[in-house]
Amino acid sequence: MKFTIVERKMKIDDDLRTYALRKVEKLDRYFQQDSDTTITFSELRGKQTVEITVRQVGLVVRAEETTTDMYASVDGAISSIERQIRKHKTRLEKRLREGAFDKMAEQKAALTEEDFD
């Protein structure tokens, strides 16, 4: 997983940088090695915004969180991405289960017809 950190209209310290990277590295288990992650830090009118975008072949997951504390924004964006990943994973599992059932029903029907002939 490749990481890119973007700072808009502000500078972040090393503690925040390592905190964000450590949190985002936990998402590494959900994605393949060729995925790109962009973490954007920005500040507007006293509000701290963190935007995290993970790009992988066939999938883009994006989350943005705005609070008064940058660390809380990182935590909120990470939890939002984890929620999206769980939702996507559940959707894929349901699709695979439904497809598997249809294939089994077709095979069983074909076997039943052959037995009667």
Which functions belong to the PLM regions below?
Residues 1-117:
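N-terminal, polar/charged subdomain of small-to-medium soluble alpha/beta proteins
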